[in-house]
Amino acid sequence: MTDQEILNALTGILRDVLLDDTIVLTEDTRRDEVAHWDSFNYINFIVAVEVKFGVKFRVADIESFENVGAIVKQLKTMGR
C-alpha cells in the first residue's frame, strides 16, 4: 500500500470510531487536534487499525506515536 492508501484507511477507521464523517487526517495530524479523540477512543482506533491491517503494535510503539504519520511509517515497516 502507498502512504496515501494507508492514510485513507486510517481516516476511514477514525471516522468510524468517532462517528464523524468530516474528519480528514494528514500525516501531521495529532490526537489533540481532533475533537473527541481521547485516550479511550485512541485505544479503540489502535485496535481497529490492528484488525484492519492484521498487525499487533507493541505497547512502546503505541505510546510513541506522535502523529498519524508515525502510524503510517510503522505500518509500512511492518510490511503493510
Where are the language model's segments positioned?
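Phosphopantetheine-dependent thiolation modules in NRPS/PKS and related acyl-activating systems
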Residues: 2-47, 51-80
